[in-house]
Design a protein with these regions (language model features):
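N-terminal targeting/anchoring "stem" of glycan-biosynthesis enzymes
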Residues: 1-238
């Protein structure tokens, strides 16, 4: 594989040189190992592109194995994502030349909508009719009836990225959020505890409280978040 990548370097050099000759070619790395960044950064980029703030012949590559296959699929419908190592190599070769920043895709402020474009444009990612039908079927299987409203409970768990201890201050105990979940459930909302890697199950039982983290699915992680009433998450103070 390493030898194959070396063989691609001359071709990458041709592409990079072409970009210096006037072709508006740009390369971008998708922050694929973090769902928030994978969705947020790309939504900012797509809205900025729609507003005319980001222009070029843009080619993307995944910076890591996508943390959510459904989200990766939806992104592949609206941006060019190279599944081969070639675009990554082009991005590396690009950085060897002065003025490389001009040929690297960026947003105004990473994953912050500083231009308030989210208020101006609808979500740039969408589900197909077949995916919507599948999502509604899965909701019924989870016990959420048609027309019901749900709140996604997002509590960062110590099982998330245990190899990054400097982020441990962001972790919280799901048990501390149980009273809030119960209060919402008693008001008629369904509460869906989100998450992919968790240490403990939801400590309370209620017909309208669903511990999705214990039955995680890539597709429903996106579908639930896209159709929720709101999210209940942790807020951090310094």
């Amino acid at each position: 594989m390493k030898f194959l990548r070396l063989l691609l370097v001359p071709f990458a050099l041709v592409v990079v040189l072409a970009s210096r000759l006037g072709l508006p070619i740009r390369f971008g790395r998708i922050w694929s190992d973090r769902m928030g960044h994978m969705a947020g950064n790309m939504e900012c980029y797509l809205c900025e592109r729609k507003a005319g703030l980001s222009q070029g012949w843009d080619f993307w590559f995944h910076g890591a194995e996508p943390c959510n296959k459904q989200l990766a699929l939806m992104l592949s419908r609206v941006v060019r994502i190279d599944p081969t190592p070639f675009t990554r190599i082009c991005a590396m070769v690009n950085r060897l030349f002065a003025g490389w920043q001009k040929h690297e895709i960026d947003t105004l402020q990473v994953d912050r909508d500083v231009a308030n474009l989210f208020d101006k444009y609808p979500p740039q990612l969408s589900f197909t009719p077949e995916e919507i039908a599948h999502g509604e079927t899965q909701l019924a299987r989870m016990g959420i009836p048609e027309g019901a409203k749900w709140v996604c409970l997002i509590v960062r768990d110590a099982a998330k990225h245990p190899h990054l201890p400097y982020h441990s201050y962001r972790n919280a105990d799901i048990a501390a959020h149980a009273p809030a979940a119960l209060a919402l459930a008693e008001r008629g909302y369904y509460v869906v505890r989100m998450g992919k890697d968790v240490l403990h199950p939801m400590p309370i039982k209620h017909p309208r409280i669903i511990d999705f983290a214990m039955q995680y699915d890539d597709f429903m992680a996106v579908y639930l978040g896209a159709h929720e009433v709101t999210s209940a998450a942790c807020v951090y103070f310094r």
